[in-house]
Amino acid sequence: MSSEKKALIEYWKATGLVTNEKVLKAIEKVPRENFVLPKYKEFAYLDEPLPLFSEQTISQPTTVAIMTDALEVKPGQKVLEIGTGSGYQAAILSELVGPKGKIITIERIKKLVDFARKNLKNYKNVKIIHADGTKGYLREAPYDRIIVTASASELPNTLFAQLKEKGIMVIPLEDHLFKITKIKGNPMYKDLGLFLFVPLLKGKV
């Protein structure tokens, strides 16, 4: 493990931002440098977002860690991710659900789909779909967990409908990140603080 990566993990522990050892081990295991563009490899463990294609970014490591921690993923679960990007978040989720779990990840930008497929070729429990993420993926629903890596103006009902009862969704709404638990069919919100994300867009390109 690089000194920069170790320093990040120690920072999360010391500040209490992320304390779940399983999450920390999954992040430790997945090499972020394999999910950034080649010219940014040396910056892989800077705690900031890095450019990808089509004005998209790979989220900063602390944001990924906080979202993953909030999702409370367990082995064997089925997780829907909206916004594959380079595949980094999906790789971490793959480690957490294990061989009996499944990650369905949707990306609207074809260039990113191709990049993520190359990056995730050794993650056999990850299925990448080129589609409009705002519609979710009904074929595999319902999901134990849903994570959205782009900001919506309000809770997308189509996605929430695909979440199991007592399931958890982590999603940015406007400029705040929320952990939403489905209780008796209704959303229970927990505000995780101020975060900046690219917008959640319809359609595919």
Regions found by a protein language model. Give the residues of each.
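Generic structural signal for secondary-structure transition and capping sites
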Residues: 32-35, 125, 168, 197
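Short clusters of hydrophobic/aromatic residues that line enzyme substrate/ligand-binding pockets
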Residues: 35-36, 45, 50-52, 97, ...
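Conserved SAM-binding loop and adjacent beta-strand
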Residues: 17-18, 33-40, 50-68, 72-73
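Core SAM-dependent methyltransferase catalytic element
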Residues: 177-205
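Cytosolic histidine kinase catalytic core of two-component systems
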Residues: 21-22, 62, 111
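Conserved nucleotide-cofactor-binding alpha/beta core module
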Residues: 72-186
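N-terminal auxiliary segments of SAM/dcSAM-dependent transferases
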Residues: 1-39, 204
